[in-house]
Curated annotation (Swiss-Prot):
Gene3D superfamilies: beta-sandwich domain of Sec23/24, Sec23/Sec24 helical domain, Severin, von Willebrand factor, type A domain, Zn-finger domain of Sec23/24
Gene Ontology CC: one annotated term: COPII vesicle coat
Recorded topology in the membrane: Peripheral membrane protein
Designated gene of the protein: SEC23C
Signal sequence bounds: none
Protein name per Swiss-Prot or TrEMBL: Protein transport protein SEC23 C
UniProt binding sites for Zn(2+): 60, 63, 82, 85
Region Zinc finger-like: start-end pairs: 60-85
Taxonomic source organism: Arabidopsis thaliana
Family to which the UniProt record says this protein belongs: Belongs to the SEC23/SEC24 family. SEC24 subfamily.
Cell compartments where the protein resides: Cytoplasmic vesicle, COPII-coated vesicle membrane; Endoplasmic reticulum membrane; Membrane
Length: 761
């Protein structure tokens, strides 16, 4: 799979089918199980800064695609042919010197991904951060949160615009521009507040009269900059005031009965935050950063009543349609999502609670705006603390936050777009590229991406038109399909840029070219696409059976590409390009994306939101965790994700993306407890203990959200974090130091045996 990694490094794209199958109208499409699709990372860092071009792109007059290496150039006539619509376009005067030995950079063969600087003369706008803080917390948790906020504020640039809102049963909007004392405006948490009501109550039109018509949006459209600066102002101007307000901030003063939950109006607070940003900074790089410590119990967006006797909804309640608050809350957050997308703003949620806070309902607003979600047990936990630090820091290890993105696609006429599964919102740009079948955000060829970073990855799903007969192949002018992805965005330095990626993939008749299709099959990308499709279908199709769907897809794919003798299971084999795919499917069936019964709706929503925005390599770790062995007998090495890998004299490091587990075998644990690693004559043992911790620290420093670290011993209570991910052994195996795992799940070998029998019979 190294060659697919090279393609990803160049263009940020991984496709399950790198040679695309085409079928006649009388045949079953091979891609009906794993669709023709692409996992694309729009802002993957370029290999060379020379591919940043300081001018505007040259576009086709007919289809608006951008000049690219696959364009056919006629130097004598000084024009170029578009590979998408075949229209010929003249070069403008500034391209008059184009020649075979004097090509512009966008025509170089390796320039399949280039970036254009769209407004080199405009002044960059500063980022805006509006903090929305839940005060219905115990004092210890609030102190943890305040400590992290102080650290975050110190990391933000002085030019960034800051604001503060707090909430319990009331919402407080702080006037940070008032220098004499702490001043805030109160809003009741029981009812929604429109933008006009908000502006009236915040006295925005005392000095300047309210416009009689038109949209009130920012200093240019009805609001004075002085009024805006009362609530949202540069960090350098409000640093002292904001620190003072946070230092004085106490937990909610309202008494809470022992059998009740606190009155928490999360929905109203977020609505007020969105309206304030929409009025003051529309279309700017603004983020609402919400810090939530429990479930919303009051006003729009509430997910449960205040009585503790009323349990928070479970998966079973949602499936049976007996979750009383769920649908109303989702409807409210869908409305909030539309408002934020229209304004171009991002919602980030940092949830820290042992209880559910409503991530399942908030999911639509966070996902459609491209926001982050972090789920931790406490505001003092490193998962929250380090993740917040990564969002706010700038420099070598930052996330590369960008904003105000618009993603568009062009492709060959026989390809239609079914949709995108990922952090974006449809712009409802209908046209000939749109398929009748919608997957995820469908029925459009353009999407809004309010927030995106260097790792944000979207899954595009395509539909390939069937041909009448195989004779059409012989008459075809070209056996290439072309795709062009265009991403407009505001860079973290304030520049507006356009990233253009143009791809070419060969197509073949599926049933006649199985070997060629097999050679171009990327099984890692296929597993990730399957995981996204399953998760999306489980969210939108109540009767969907994920195990049956994925099993059918695997059986059909292996039937197409497997080599076997009829009736002889032992003869079955797959080529190296597909040999690991059944193993991926086995682990996908057992993963948190399919098996939701052991997780809350909030946890399931959290896992899926992270899956929807991560690249292939990170997503594969979520599906099939990696296991590394550390011992005296060999250097660190990856080993099978199997119970047989446990040994008394071995340390294991499990990486399941969300959790890192350092597991000490029983002998290693005894030596550690005896303190041998502190003795000079046992330095080698000390190095052995430290080695997995160094590996884990490296992973934690590069990953977002920061994973949870669990350090445990064999036979200890927390060893369950490792054992739950391991493949159970068959029967009564006798491995040295092996733990017994009692489970209803079949082992990988039994799963593969059943697969072989089904295929050959």
């Amino acid at each position: 799979m190294a060659e697919f990694g090279e393609l990803e490094a160049q263009d940020g794209v991984r496709m399950p089918w790198n040679i695309i199958p085409v079928a006649t109208k009388k045949e079953q499409s091979i891609d009906s199980e794993v669709p023709v699709s692409a996992i694309y990372t729009p802002l993957k860092p370029l290999r060379s800064q020379s591919l940043l071009l300081p001018y505007s792109p040259l576009r086709c007059r007919t289809c608006r695609s951008v000049l690219n290496p696959y364009s056919v150039v006629d130097f004598s006539a000084c024009n170029w042919g578009c590979p998408f619509c075949f229209n010929r376009n003249p070069f403008p005067l500034n391209y008059s010197s184009v020649a075979d030995n004097n090509l512009p950079p966008e025509l170089f063969p390796h320039s399949t991904t280039v970036e254009y600087l769209c407004d080199s003369f405009s002044s960059p706008s500063p980022p805006v951060f509006l903090f929305v803080v839940d005060t219905c917390l115990i004092s210890e948790e609030l102190d943890f949160l305040k400590s992290s906020l102080f650290q975050a504020l110190d990391l933000l640039p002085d030019t960034s615009i800051l604001g503060l809102i707090t909430f319990d049963s009331l919402v407080r909007v702080y006037e940070l521009g008032f220098p004499h004392c702490t001043k805030s405006y109160f809003f009741h948490g029981n009812k929604d507040c429109t933008k006009d009501q908000l502006l009236d109550q915040l006295s925005f039109f005392v000095k300047n009269p309210k416009p009689s018509s038109g949209v009130i949006a920012g200093a240019r459209d009805g609001l004075s900059s002085d009024d805006i600066a009362r609530f949202l102002l540069p960090a350098s101007d409000c640093h002292f005031t904001l620190h003072s307000v946070l230092e004085e901030l106490g937990n909610s003063p309202w008494p809470v009965a022992a059998d009740h939950r606190p009155a928490r109006c999360t929905g109203v607070a977020l609505r007020i935050a969105a309206s304030l940003l929409g009025a003051c900074f529309p279309g700017s790089a603004a983020r609402i950063m919400a810090f939530i410590g429990g479930p919303s119990t009051q006003g729009p967006g509430a997910i449960v009543s205040r009585e503790l006797s009323d349990p928070i909804r479970s998966h079973k309640d949602i499936d049976k349609d007996s979750a009383m608050y769920y649908h109303k809350a989702v409807e409210f957050y869908e409305m909030l999502a539309k408002q934020l997308v229209h304004q171009g703003h991002v919602l980030d949620v940092f949830a820290s609670s042992v209880d559910q806070v409503g991530i399942a309902e908030l999911k639509v607003a966070v996902e459609q705006t491209g926001g982050f979600v972090v789920l931790a047990e406490s505001f003092g936990h490193s998962v929250f603390r380090d993740s917040l630090k990564r969002v706010c820091q700038s420099g070598e290890n930052d996330l590369g936050l960008s904003s105000c993105g618009i993603f568009e696609i062009n492709c060959s006429k026989d390809i239609k777009v079914q949709g995108i599964i990922g952090p974006c919102a449809s712009l409802e740009k209908k046209g000939p590229l749109c398929s009748d079948t919608a997957i995820g955000q469908g029925h459009t060829s353009a999407w809004k991406m309010c927030g995106l970073d260097n790792n944000t990855s979207i899954c595009l799903v395509f539909e390939i038109a069937k041909i009448d007969t195989a004779d059409v192949v012989l008459q075809s002018q070209s056996n290439q399909f072309y795709f062009q992805f265009l991403t407009y965005y505001q860079h973290s330095n304030g520049q507006t840029r356009l990233r253009v990626t143009t791809l070419s993939r060969r197509w073949v008749m599926g049933t006649e070219s199985l070997q060629e299709l097999s050679n171009g099959f990327d099984q890692e990308a296929a597993a990730v696409v399957m995981a996204r499709l399953i998760s999306s279908k489980m969210e939108t199709q109540p009767e969907f059976n994920p195990q049956r769907w994925v099993d059918k897809a695997l059986i059909n794919l292996c039937t197409w590409f497997g080599d076997y003798q009829k009736g002889n299971p032992s003869s079955f084999s797959l080529s190296s390009q597909l040999s690991i795919f059944p193993q991926f499917v086995f682990h996908l069936r057992r993963s948190q994306f399919v098996q939701v019964f052991n997780n809350s709706p909030d946890e399931t929503a959290y896992f899926r939101m992270i899956l929807y925005r991560e690249n292939v390599s990170n997503s594969v770790v979520m599906i099939q965790p990696s296991l590394i062995s550390f011992s005296f007998h060999s250097p660190p090495e990856p080993i099978l994700l199997d119970v047989a890998s446990i040994a008394a004299d071995r340390i294991l490091l499990l990486d399941s993306y969300f959790t890192l587990v350092i597991f000490h075998g029983s002998t290693i644990a005894q030596w550690r407890k005896a303190g041998y690693h502190n003795q000079p004559e046992h330095q080698a043992f000390g190095h052995l203990l430290q080695s997995p911790r160094d590996y884990a620290d490296t992973i934690m420093s590069e990953r977002f959200p920061t994973p949870r670290l669990v350090i445990c011993d064999q036979y200890g209570s927390q060893a369950r974090f490792l054992l739950a991910k391991l493949n159970p052994c068959d029967g009564d195996a006798h491995f040295s130091g092996q733990s017994n795992v009692f489970t209803d799940d079949v082992s990988l070998s039994v799963f593969l045996d059943h697969l072989r029998r089904l295929i050959v019979h």
